Amino acid sequence: MLVLLAAIFVVHIATCVMLFVSTIANVWVVSDSINASVGLWRNCTSGDCSGGLSYGHEDALKAVQAFMILSIIFSVISLIIFVFQLFTMEKGNRFFLSGATMLVCWLCVLIGASIYTHRYANGDSNTFDRSHHGYSFILAWICFCFSFVVGVLYLVLRKK
């Protein structure tokens, strides 16, 4: 049981770190023809990330930014709640609050990544002729899977 809790804790920390990286890094879509990438915040060309996004004023992008930031917040809150429950909760109880908070994080990642996929990652809306998904986009979807698994495991596990 202790090994399982430690493994879940490590995956939860990895999820928090990957959420930070995927939200902050400007590599959601990468151009195949030129050395350029686009993120949630900036457009990077040849290593220079000083240019803003041409569609930065759109509500869909602002929603993606908001949901990704909310997912980070809920993931960190869930981690703090888990550590608190680990030391204060009576034996035999389940980690309901940690699990519920992590599932809210999962929902925020789902909404944010889905909006970005629909609006910007299909190739029609970005400024590149040929492009592919960057590591930030892929990390966001990996965090989607991890946060769901961690949230469900928190709901199922009991403290022994």
Curated annotation (Swiss-Prot):
Most abundant in squamous epithelia. It is a multi-pass membrane protein. GO terms for cellular component: plasma membrane. Its main location: membrane. The chain crosses the membrane at residues 1-21, 67-87, 95-115, 137-157. InterPro entries: EMP_1, PMP-22/EMP/MP20-like, PMP22/EMP/MP20/Claudin, PMP22_EMP_MP20. Coiled coil: none annotated. Glycans are attached at N35, N43. It is found in: Membrane. PROSITE patterns: PMP22_1 (PS01221), PMP22_2 (PS01222). It comes from the Eukaryota. It holds the Pfam family PMP22_Claudin. Keywords: Glycoprotein, Membrane, Transmembrane, Transmembrane helix. Belongs to the PMP-22/EMP/MP20 family. This is Epithelial membrane protein 1. It comes from Oryctolagus cuniculus (Rabbit). The gene is EMP1.
